[in-house]
Amino acid sequence: MSSLDLQDAELTTPELVILDMVAENKEEAAAQLAARLFESGRISNLEGFLEQVNSREHQMATGLPGGVGIPHARSEHVQQTSIAVGVTRYGHSLDFGAVDGRATLILLIATPAQSFSEHLEVLATLARSLFKENFRESLRRAHDEEVIAELINSSLVFFDH
């Protein structure tokens, strides 16, 4: 059993979802999402965490096919594994380096520094869901923070812990 028990802690909540997100670039999008994590007490140091997210982003693009960006970092500033979600405003998109174009769904994944295997499992499990067009479209069309949080959390119910 890993430190993450999905029955006890939801990875995302409606408060961690931004609808109609508008950002100048991927760094600003990550900053908006990280601010939600900070406000909810899920990260302890906003600037320190963002430095790590941006450093990770410079190492390798985090764009997935189908218009998804998944900036992520393992960090000592993370209190609990969390996912903040941004759905861009209609007609707005951001470059996360995906070969097929810009992102309209951004999922910021934050895991504690010591949780290496958990970080990889969350990334892999979420990526499997995000590769399905119907899942991506459900997130984009929801227009409701509660529904989006539930979709993300339910996609990770079978997370092997």
Where are these regions (language model features)?
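Cytosolic covalent-transfer regions centered on His/Cys nucleophiles
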Residues: 1-161
